[in-house]
Structure formats: structure tokens, C-alpha cells
């Protein structure tokens, strides 16, 4: 796009050759009249991730791997006032960026948000109820329980962003100092980041962090 991007989509990767193409195609095919850019922050993959990603996005090779470091490293190289962080196995629908941008334009007090998550790669499970046969995935209850978890976190005024999709205003991201560098393999980057945002909003006496139940993304259930 010729005009300066208003949205920067940032995807950290490390050996994601089996997932990255689908995710980037989903971002590339957005029906969005807002200028946006696609940035891949690669942590020195040893597979074909970078080769694939360069067909769809601007790729930066970071000096070391680690999701927090990779994301923080590329943010200064982006232009958008709205930062969209996606995992390499997360899929968005074709109107995702348009809808997200409108939400932030309408709600000036919104600091950051995540869309609801649905896990897409579970195995089908069939069961019979009376004469009817029903089929669900083995992630059905995981999807439901995760939805309840984030709903009640928000209800109790301790909202938690979802790591596979975090959308935040650039200025707010910079105010909290980006993602905290946690020890390797320690789960909880998104919770620590959410807590930093909650602290900032209370200190500033303004700002909201939300999970959007009316917008969803698909992501892998791998852990």
C-alpha cells in the first residue's frame, strides 16, 4: 500500500514452516480499506519459515529467539498506530482488521484487546443422544472453558489478554515498555503484560482492556 500503514500486523516465528503460510495468506487477504503492513519477526529459524514468509511479508531476523524479544525488537521498525500481534498458527477472517480498527476508533478509551479464541485442529468425537448422532471436537470443552475463564476475568476487573492475538495502541505499548522478558519456557507472558496494562490504566485513571466476545480468531490447540 502506498500510504503510511495505520495498522502493523506483527507475527513472531521460530520454525513455523507448517503454519506460517496459512496465517500470512489470511492477513494478506483482508478486506480492509485501512493501510496496513505485515511484519514477521523470526528468531533465526532453521527450517523454511523465512523463505515462505518473505513471499507475503517484511521479515526481520532477530538477534535471538524468544517471543517477547522478537516482538519488542521489531516494533520500532513498524509504522502503525495500532499494533496487532498474532501467533504463527492463528487465522483471522477477512474483515478482522477492518472490524478491529473501527472498534479502536469508536472507543478512544480502549487500550488493548483480544478476540475470542477457537481451537481449530481438534479430532472429531461422535456421540449418540437418543436417536441423534452428534459430532464435536475434543477441543469443544476447552473452547468453552477458556471462554468462561476470560469472561470472568473481565467481569472481576482483572482482564487478561490472549497471547495468540493481542491488539494494542502503539503509544500504550511503549508506555508499558513492551513485553517483559521472562525466563525461557515460562508460560505467562500474556498475563504479565495484561497486569502491566491494568496497573497503567489504574495509574492513569483511564483506559480499558477487553476480550471481545463478538469477534473470534482460530488458533492451534498445541501447547
How should each PLM-predicted stretch be described?
Residues 25-35:
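Short, acidic, metal-binding catalytic loop of nucleotide-sugar glycosyltransferases
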Residues 26, 42-50, 90:
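A conserved acidic beta->alpha catalytic loop
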Residues 83:
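Short aromatic/hydrophobic "clamp" motif used to bind/position activated sugar donors
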Residues 115-121, 130-159:
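Short, flexible, basic/aromatic active-site loop/helix in glycosyltransferases
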Residues 36, 50-77:
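Conserved donor nucleotide-binding strand/loop of the catalytic core
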Residues 1-26:
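N-proximal low-complexity "stem/linker" segments adjacent to membrane-targeting elements
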Amino acid at each position: 500500500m502506498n500510504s503510511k500503514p495505520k495498522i502493523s500486523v506483527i507475527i513472531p516465528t521460530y520454525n513455523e514452516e507448517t503454519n506460517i503460510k496459512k496465517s500470512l495468506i489470511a492477513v494478506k487477504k483482508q478486506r480492509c480499506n485501512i493501510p496496513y503492513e505485515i511484519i514477521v519477526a523470526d528468531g533465526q529459524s532453521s527450517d523454511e519459515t523465512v523463505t515462505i514468509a518473505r513471499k507475503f511479508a517484511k521479515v526481520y531476523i532477530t538477534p535471538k529467539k524468544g517471543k517477547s524479544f522478537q516482538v519488542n525488537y521489531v516494533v520500532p521498525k513498524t509504522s502503525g498506530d495500532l499494533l496487532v500481534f498474532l501467533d504463527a498458527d492463528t487465522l483471522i477472517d477477512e474483515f478482522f482488521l477492518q472490524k478491529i480498527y473501527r472498534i479502536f476508533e469508536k472507543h478512544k478509551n480502549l487500550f488493548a484487546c483480544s478476540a475470542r479464541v477457537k481451537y481449530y485442529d481438534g479430532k472429531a468425537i461422535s456421540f449418540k443422544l437418543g436417536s441423534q448422532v452428534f459430532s464435536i471436537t475434543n477441543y469443544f470443552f476447552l473452547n468453552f472453558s477458556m471462554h468462561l475463564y476470560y469472561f470472568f476475568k473481565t467481569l472481576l476487573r482483572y482482564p487478561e489478554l490472549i497471547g495468540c492475538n493481542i491488539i494494542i495502541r502503539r503509544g500504550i505499548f511503549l508506555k508499558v515498555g513492551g513485553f517483559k522478558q521472562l525466563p525461557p519456557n515460562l508460560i505467562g507472558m500474556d498475563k504479565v503484560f495484561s497486569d502491566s496494562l491494568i496497573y497503567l490504566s489504574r495509574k492513569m485513571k483511564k483506559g480499558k482492556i477487553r476480550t471481545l466476545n463478538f469477534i473470534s480468531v482460530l488458533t492451534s490447540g498445541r501447547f
